[in-house]
Amino acid sequence: MTETKRFDVAATFGVQARPGLEVLGFADATHPQIPVPRPYCFRNVLLRDVLAYLHDAGGDGLFLTGPTGSGKTSLVTQIAARLNWPVQSVTCHGRMELNALVGQFVLVQGETRFVHGPLAVAARDGHLLILNESDLMDPAELAGLNDILEGQPLVIPENGGEVIRPHPRFRVFATGNSMGAGDGSGLYPGILRQNLAFMDRFRVIHVDYPDPDVEKAVVLQAVPRLPELIVDKMIVVAGEVRRLFVGAGSEGGPELTLTMSTRTLVRWASLSLAFKGAPRVFEYALRQALTARAEPEQREAIHRIAADVFGDYWEPRP
């Protein structure tokens, strides 16, 4: 994939933009690592920040921080989908080592062969590397990315000293629920404080939950047959659950230990339509979408919020 193509920003992303404003992507739309384009409502400021980084990384990575399910990863993948930009996506965890990103020897048809990892492939071929939940990974391992983030060659001693010089279109994204400084809220078990030198190599943008109007458009794109009145009520419920999750206005901190992400909201809407006609359909769908994994007291609290918002729609009277 070497041939590039210019894309009109307004037409490609469905946003208002200066006439003639273009962004560079790839001409080949057949690469298997290009994400599948899905209905998506781009937020102008976030789109601008990601496109600016894609245009000129300046020796940086881009760290996207925000609450769970706010759309950090989908923002990047849906931009990539529209620019025909292949993506190497990895979900990090506490036991992941740098070798899993660079590559390692594996047994292939009875022979030991070196297989390049997502970092090596992305750097070599000009793909996007997305490190999902990067703040779950051991900071000592992530620090091994410092040099390549600055444009230095990736040297692989295990493969005979192979040297991979980063492709000019190679970009590194990392997502996390923290800003690299650990989790002071206690809501995200497993998050680790990251190495300061590693974080210093990233630009940082905050991806919060969409505004109600944007979120309404997202839900209606995904579930167009659901009445707008019901979607509006679902969004009000989601907003209240999130407020209690982050502890807004509460001196005692968070009152809920789970939240309603945009993807959970879409799931609730989809299930409500799928179970249309069932008794107490919105409660039934909400339980499957979110509250079945909540503590009983928190489940009751969320259902009470929903009942107050939905009124007679929650439990229709005979």
State the predicted function of each range:
Residues 1-318:
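C-terminal regulatory/interaction module of P-loop NTP-utilizing enzymes
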